[in-house]
Amino acid sequence: TVLIEKLRELRVDIDFQYVQRHFLGYSFKSVREKVFDNFHVNLPKSFEAEYRTVLLEQFRCELQPTDGVQALLSGLQLQFCLATSSSPERTAEALRISGLEDFFTAKIFTAEDVSQGKPAPDLFLYAATKMGVAPSECLVIEDSHAGVTAAISAGMQVAHYTGGRHLAGTVSKVIDAFPHVPVIPHWKDLVELLPAAE
């Protein structure tokens, strides 16, 4: 809703469903380009910083870890990392607020690490290289159409996580586009998909 409100100040009138379908999983750079391409509005230089300030304030009031993720990460017996379209600052704050930062020390890769973000495979390939793992041996857990596309393009296995509150209105789009991709409504479902997660 923060992005919707900030864009409305510039007379870009979109709703929650539009954001979910067109911006979820994309870097801010990509969002900026999409706004220009679709609405012919060039976001001012100050827009990103102002948006992130308000967003982080909202995070501090509302952000919570999804049910079961801490238990899963605590018991995971294999290498894992975080590869996200968010900025380093937003990622660090989100992990701190949700109590997950200790799980990802030195294992965080963001959109700023690559020239092309999702749906290009660059971020996932970069993360795999840094982790010393072949793409074919990686399992990506993604919640967005752009992310699932990127994982498939990277030659990685992928599962579609649908348990986040922010995903309303987007699940069917991903399932329809990728009917062969396993769906994970809850983190406990990952254990059934990946025995090594126990």
Regions found by a protein language model. Give the residues of each.
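Metal-dependent phosphoesterase signature
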Residues: 13, 33-71
